[in-house]
Amino acid sequence: MFRKQNLKWLGVLATIIMTFVQLGGALVTKTGSEDGCGSSWPLCNGALLPENLPIQTIIELSHRAVSAISLIVVLWLVITAWKNIGYIKEIKPLSIISVGFLLVQALVGAAAVIWQQNPYVLALHFGISLISFSSVFLMTLIIFSIDKKYEADILFIHKPLRILTWLMAIIVYLTIYTGALVRHTKSSLAYGAWPIPFDDIVPHNAHDWVQFSHRGMAFITFIWIMITFIHAIKNYSDNRTVRYGYTASFILVILQVITGALSVITNVNLIIALFHALFITYLFGMIAYFILLMLRTTRSLK
């Protein structure tokens, strides 16, 4: 027998596990554990469970295990949602995207282990995983909105905010790519002091340019989200969905900037780096939700 409450718990579980997949990937990169299992995949150093287990191997194995569990739980969520609430227009496309990108994410990760891809390709891995996470996150939000306690179904987003939000999505995604590139090119401590080394502003090598590009994109992201937030609060003050959503996004980008700065100041403290990955994960999830609302608005115009 289908119960909405069970589906809600399943959605929350899937979202939490997908969050740990994101954090696990960041942990693997930050600790240099990419080669913890050698060039073996899905085995680890040629065995299901190798005898020698240094910390890098444990981290890589744990990430693979959580990724495998996430696939099972997401499939469970997708099948249950498709069967019971598939009449909701977004459920089936989101189901396909969540599973599809989860598989692509796994294949890119496997290719990185087996063939040692260059950092510019590896940087795509985090962005792909964020799309999968966001699909699961959106499904969970839709499941919770079934009881009609929210105003999202009757929300109409006008063109100015739609344009600002679409541009925000593009800018944030580019910033995410440059951030992943910083990790994969080992450029976290390049380009000197934060926000810029005033005594030596011009980047000198590829690592400096990667870090410089990410800081520049992060600055643009912060300014653009602030502009979008001000517009949303000013013009949609009577709508809780917009007010809370864009406020949450602005808070998340502030936290993202703070943890980014602290990462440089503390020489990439691991806990701060993981919070940096966590905040951008949920910021992207919020932007994905705004896109969902905008698509509903566009559909209502036809």
UniProtKB/Swiss-Prot annotation:
Record organism: Staphylococcus epidermidis (strain ATCC 12228 / FDA PCI 1200)
Domain of life: Bacteria
Residue ranges annotated as Extracellular topological domain: 30-67, 115-125, 183-215, 266-270
Gene Ontology BP terms: heme A biosynthetic process
Entry's Gene Ontology cellular component terms: plasma membrane
Chain's role: Catalyzes the conversion of heme O to heme A by two successive hydroxylations of the methyl group at C8. The first hydroxylation forms heme I, the second hydroxylation results in an unstable dihydroxymethyl group, which spontaneously dehydrates, resulting in the formyl group of heme A.
Protein EC: 1.17.99.9
Reaction catalyzed: Fe(II)-heme o + 2 A + H2O = Fe(II)-heme a + 2 AH2
Molecular function terms from GO: metal ion binding; oxidoreductase activity, acting on NAD(P)H, heme protein as acceptor
Name used for this protein in its record: Heme A synthase
Positions annotated to bind heme b: H214, H276
Subunit structure: Interacts with CtaB.
Sequence positions that bind heme o: H63, H125
Cytoplasmic side: 1-8, 89-93, 147-161, 237-244, 292-302
Localisation per UniProt entry: Cell membrane
Domain remark in the UniProt entry: The N-half (TM1-TM4) and C-half (TM5-TM8) domains are connected by an intracellular loop. Each domain is formed from four-helix bundles and they align in a pseudo twofold symmetry manner. The N-half domain is the substrate-heme O binding domain and the C-half domain is the cofactor heme B binding domain. The cysteines of disulfide bond Cys-37 and Cys-44 may be involved in transfer of reducing equivalents from quinol in the membrane to the active site of the enzyme.
TM region positions: 9-29, 68-88, 94-114, 126-146, 162-182, 216-236, 245-265, 271-291
Pathway membership, UniProt: Porphyrin-containing compound metabolism; heme A biosynthesis; heme A from heme O: step 1/1
Bridged cysteine pairs (disulfide): C37-C44
Active site residues per record: E60
Coiled coil: none
